[in-house]
Amino acid sequence: MRNIHLLTGKPVFAPMGSTANKHGRLIANNIMGLGEKFKGILGTAVVKVFDCNVGKSGLTESQAREAKFDVVTTLVPSSDVPHYYPTKKPLLLKLIADRKTRKLLGIQGVGPGEVVKRIDVLATGMSLGATIDDLPSFDLGYAPPYSTAIDIAAHAANVLRNKIDGIAPFITPMEVKDMADRGEDFLWLDVRSPEEYKEKRIEDPRVKLVPLGMLRRRIQELPRGKKIVTLCKAGLRAYEAQTILEGSGFKDVRIMDGGVEAWPYELKSEK
């Protein structure tokens, strides 16, 4: 049976046992004369692949573009609980939103961490027409065994807000890869530690390692007239580096979404 997608209003084929059971109840209610209508679906799906949890809800980036939304995305790696908690596990979220209406259009998540909780929360938000401005104010359950103080889903929404509002000039890994493949002349500024760099890194002659703590002392090594893309492990230090460079007069500095943890291409390792 085809359903109507809640975000596009168009028919969609997404067979799920959960949807079939909802249809069964709705049919029974209508047989009894209750006049109930099924509003539609988001195509939410989750699956466990060995030790990895995978989930999605709403539109993918390509589906959102095909539906003519003004698409903006973010990639946010994190742990599912605070970094100091012994049960922490990594996960990666991708959020898709519409730049004009600021409505959340989709979420995808992967990792050994608790992915499904985030999928369910944001699927609920999308069902109710939530915007990325609504999500950070959701009053979710918090304690260190279950979540970070600001949950990764809310953090991802905040990153999208910063993108749309021009607070932080992000660029996606795919856009950076396209720049590199076209042979563009830019500086890829890695602000992680030398140990992190040896463990895994992007192998490219445009990459320059300057740990964040040394950036101000070595800032004269950087070309002021060249585009600079900052990166770190997950994005925070890259953001700090961008603000340092912008404050020092650099004009064209971007932050790579999600850092090395969200880089979907080959990495070099010295392990």
What positions do the PLM features span?
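Mid-to-C-terminal Rossmann-like scaffold of FAD/NAD(P)H-dependent oxidoreductases
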Residues: 2-111, 148, 152-153, 157-178, ...
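Short amphipathic alpha-helical face segments that pack within enzyme cores
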Residues: 19-26, 117, 121, 240
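Short, well-ordered alpha-helices that flank and scaffold nucleotide-derived cofactor binding pockets
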Residues: 29, 33, 124, 243-247
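A short, polar/charged loop-to-alpha-helix boundary motif
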Residues: 113-130
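Rhodanese-like catalytic fold shared by cysteine-dependent sulfurtransferases
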Residues: 133-186, 194-229, 233-271
